[in-house]
Amino acid sequence: MIKIAVCDDEPFMRAEMASRISGYMEEKKIPCQLHCFGGGGEILGSDMAFDILFLDIQMEGMDGMEAARLMRARGYGGMLIFITVLKEEVFEAFEVRAFDYLVKPLEDSRFKRTMGRALAALVQEPG
């Protein structure tokens, strides 16, 4: 089962992302566990055992880029997909080995393309 997390400090955006992800996974008939977090501190307090993490950059307190750096330093090897309004942070995302970078408001076709690529990459990973 694929484990997916969404970390965004805006409740509406968390709910929208959860709905998009659930809908996509149901459409593809792929079982998943979906977890939602309201900030970087929350996700760092979890077991971080997610295959895919959708992470907002601009959040109150700890921003998503800082959370991503700390997660990578603690051994998180899953896919990071940033979701943000900040187009200018795209180059910094490479420093934490981001899988993709989605700009809000999300385009449905771009989201689906990213999900398809992420799931294909997971299937190809050994183990």
Features from the language model and the residues they span:
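Acidic di-acidic motifs
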Residues: 8-10, 85
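Active-site phosphate/pyrophosphate- and oxyanion-stabilizing loops and adjacent acidic/basic residues
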Residues: 19, 41, 69
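Two-component/phosphorelay signaling modules centered on CheY-like receiver
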Residues: 11-35, 73
